[in-house]
Amino acid sequence: DDKDILMVDNSFLFPDGYQYPSFFVLKDNMEINMIEKIWSENLRHVTFAFMGTYYGYQTINQAVNNLYIRKCAYYAWKEGRLALNEEYGLPVPDDEAVKVEFEKFASPFFRDQLSRIGREPIRKLKKNDRLVGPALLCMKHRIIPYFITRSIAYGMFYQDQNDKEAVELQNYISDHGIERAITHFCELDMDDVMENSLFHLILCNYNEIAKTNIIPINENVTYTN
């Protein structure tokens, strides 16, 4: 993050009388705090970045003001929060709190670049990162991660010629195909039932977005009784 604070685990022992720098923020259960941040807040942000870039937006406020993107980001976040609640007992914020966050992002003064939020997509598509991690946690608790896997699918379309990982991602898909790309970048074990199911959810979303695997019909045919 580019925030001017540093979260520090409260259990870390400093010498007696040590004066903490003003940018230190002490947190209990730092590991759980980081999981919560990455698998919910960062999940939502990268959904805005991947989808917003796909639809030609440059900044997060532009993406948030697209109703479809906003809905997908909200429901992906909600899936992740429900899984975190099941696994760690973390409460799910109410919709009013989410509304405040979305209104902040939608402000014309909040112009964070999507290229910054979505940068290094290969890292963000890895198994334990902000998308695949919570998606697998959802499946562990019998929550279908439909919108998270949709975000992953949009991530497979992510393009930025100034981003080395984005270029590598698209080159790999071009050379090896989307199916191999999903297992490779998301680090999925196809012999594992849960991970195999996740693979197919991602693939189905990708094909639907790309409008592939659709049976063509002749729309000019005239039907008579």
Model-derived regions, located:
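Substrate/ligand-engaging "lid" and interaction regions
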Residues: 1-225
